[in-house]
Amino acid sequence: IKEANMDVVRAGIILYGLWPSDEVTKEYMDLKAALSLYSTIVYLKEVDEGTPISYGGKFVADKKMKIATIPVGYGDGYPRSLSGKGYVLIRGHKAPILGRVCMDQFMVDVSHIEDVEMGDKVTLIGKDKEEVITVEELGELADKFNYEFVCGLSKRIPRTFVKNKKVIGTENYFEGVFIS
């Protein structure tokens, strides 16, 4: 905001590289996303047509499918409202969420992704090859605004702090804090 002349700044959401609202004049600053969220595939299973997926069986496989389990859920702050409409990135491909986002996990369709295997990196927020998932996009899908989304990420998610492409610290609620 030009009128503020940068005398005092309440950085807030800008620390994440996100704009606080559409009312802010964006041409004065070039923000870059400073938040990424990654996980891994912990389980893979091929299911037959007619197999219900996740709690309540809300999604039923309409063909033979390969399903991956991602160990992130609403207990970690990943919105349950992304059930059946969100997606993640695996090997540069979109993998749609199937069924409900559970407390500690959710399932995605990886039938179309070649050579997918357990341990593969999963991008929930960020870039994977040419594909990108932004906080704003997820917020729109989940009917949340960006503040609500990033503030909702729980301390169960380990944090890694990076500067100039080098890890400078980590924070893991279950293991303590390490800053180099």
Please place each PLM-identified region on the residue numbering.
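Active-site anion/phosphate-binding pocket segments in diverse small-molecule metabolic enzymes
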Residues: I1-S180
